C-alpha cells in the first residue's frame, strides 16, 4: 500500500466539513491528534461554509445550506442536543447568542444579575486571542426606586476578570450594540442610525470609536439595514427599500484590520448585488431581526420570519432563483446568528 505524504493527507482532511471530519477521529491516533493542531484547525475553519444557528424556546437547530453551486440548492436541519443546556430552566428572554469570527457563542445570565450581553471580541494586538465579553448592567439609582442607569463592563474569559469601563451615552447607545453588532478581527461593529455611521468597539483599547459613514447615504428611515461579515475579513451591509422592497448589498473593498479601522481613513464600499423586489420578503416588519450571508458574490441566503405566518424561514435568492424553506412554524420566541462550524476551542467559563 502506498502512503500519501503527511502534508497532503492533512490538506485533504482539512477540506472535509466538520460534521464529516469528526467521524474520522477514531481512525488512528495521528488523525485524532490533528484536532489539537492550531494550523489544521485554522485551515479547516477558513474553508468552512457559513451556517445558521436557530434557537427557539424548545429546540436548537443548526441549518446547513447544501448545493449552492447547483441549480436546486436546499437546506438540511440538524436538531442539536440541548438536554444539558441550563437555559431551558430559565426565562428565555435572558438568553443571547452571537458570533465572534464566525464562532457561535451562547451566553446565559441569571435574571437577578441584570446583565445584557452585547458581543464577544478580543485584543487583536496580542499574539494569543484572549476573548472578552462586552456587556452592560441595569443599575438602580436608589434601592427603593425603579429608576435605572446603564453601566458598561468587560468580562475576560480566560482570567474571569470583570471590570466596568467609562462611557458616554452621548456617543453611543449600548442597546444598538446588543441588537446590531457583528465581530470582525476581534472588534465589534454596529450601525448608528442617528448619524448614519458604523461605530466600533476596540477591545485592545477598550473604547468606542467611529469607523465610517454608511455607503447608502440616502435612505428612508423606514428602510431595513443589516450589517454582517463578508468573506471573513470585510463588512457587508444589506439595505432593503421600504417602498420598493429592492435589496442592495454593499461590501467594503479592502480587508478590515488594525491598520485601517482607526476612523481616519476613508472606507471604500462597493455595491456588490442588487436584487429586484420580485418575491423578496418584507424584512422591515420582522420581530426578531434577520441573519444573512453571501455566497460566491451572487447568492443571498437570509433568515427571517414569514410576514404573514411569522414562521421562521430560510430564503435563497440568486438571479432568477428564489427558494423559501420553512423551518419552524411553532416558534414563539427565537434567536439566530450566522456561524462557521469549526473545532477551535473557545474558553468562556
Swiss-Prot record:
Keywords: Leucine-rich repeat. Pfam families: F-box, FBA_1. It comes from Arabidopsis thaliana (Mouse-ear cress). InterPro entries: A_thaliana_F-box, F-box-assoc_dom_typ1, F-box-assoc_interact_dom, F-box-like_dom_sf, F-box_dom. Residues 1-48 form the F-box domain. Gene3D superfamilies: 1.20.1280.50. It comes from the Eukaryota. LRR repeats lie at residues 267-290. SUPFAM superfamilies: F-box domain. This is Putative F-box/LRR-repeat protein At3g16555.
